């Protein structure tokens, strides 16, 4: 659930990504759900410890999305992921467009370093379009003055993600500047492949 002080963009994001229907996701859902099969949030998650440890736990050096990484590993290994809509916690962010750019830059870096996730589960292109369409509809009904901010934020996310996907073409100081998680870059060295698998 969004925090009580969440702005309209944060409210919509929570409602869009965390629905009211309980789901059990498995390999069989990849065709229909794509990358949403492995979408989850560590802000309110539990893992079966034996499986978590058997699959190697979280990666040692990832910029973010360790929850998606682990979910993808579990689905690949034949396990299922449960989303329990009845359980609830308040978690949201009133990010500025700059902060959204930084977060999506880091998301792009994550996928550039872990291309196997999009290769095996698909990209987020269609889901991104569906999100933007839903957001505009939500704002038209509830907070129309936020539409310009939403459009700016969408552009910031798109640009950040695209730059993050090509982080190896950028100077390291630029990557650190663009990133929300700046300490990640302290131990990065360029190589022909940064895939973590």
Where are the predicted features?
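Conserved donor NDP-sugar-binding/catalytic core segment of glycosyltransferases
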Residues: 1-12
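Short secondary-structure boundary/hinge segments and terminal tails
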Residues: 4-5, 70, 92-93, 122
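Short, flexible helix-coil linker/hinge segments at the edges of structured domains or between repeats
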Residues: 12-28
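A recurrent flexible, glycine/aromatic-enriched loop bordering the glycosyltransferase active site
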Residues: 26-50, 62-63, 69, 111, ...
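A short, conserved alpha-helix in the catalytic core of glycosyltransferases
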Residues: 45-47, 51-56, 61-88
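Short, flexible helix/strand-to-coil boundary loops that buttress conserved ligand/catalytic motifs
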Residues: 56, 93, 104
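Active-site donor/metal-binding and catalytic loop motifs
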Residues: 77-101, 110-115
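Non-catalytic, C-terminal membrane-associated alpha-helical segments of glycosyltransferases
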Residues: 106, 113, 120-197
């Amino acid at each position: 659930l969004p925090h009580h002080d969440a702005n309209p963009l944060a409210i919509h994001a929570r409602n869009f990504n965390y629905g009211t229907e309980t789901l059990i996701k498995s390999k069989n859902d990849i065709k229909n759900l794509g990358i949403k099969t492995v979408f989850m949030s560590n802000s309110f998650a539990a893992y079966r410890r034996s499986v978590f440890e058997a699959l190697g736990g979280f990666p040692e050096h990832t910029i973010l999305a360790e929850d998606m990484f682990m979910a993808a590993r579990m689905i690949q290994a034949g396990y299922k992921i449960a989303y329990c809509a009845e359980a609830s916690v308040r978690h949201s962010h009133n990010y500025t467009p700059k902060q959204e750019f930084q977060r999506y830059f880091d998301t792009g870096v994550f996928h550039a370093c872990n291309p196997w996730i999009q290769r095996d589960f698909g990209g987020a292109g269609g889901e991104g379009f569906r999100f933007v369409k839903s957001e505009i509809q939500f704002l038209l009904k509830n907070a129309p003055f936020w539409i310009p901010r939403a459009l700016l934020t969408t552009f910031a996310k798109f640009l950040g993600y695209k730059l993050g996907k090509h982080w190896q073409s950028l100077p390291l100081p630029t990557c650190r500047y663009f990133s929300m998680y700046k300490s990640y870059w302290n131990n990065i060295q360029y190589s022909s492949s940064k895939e973590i698998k």
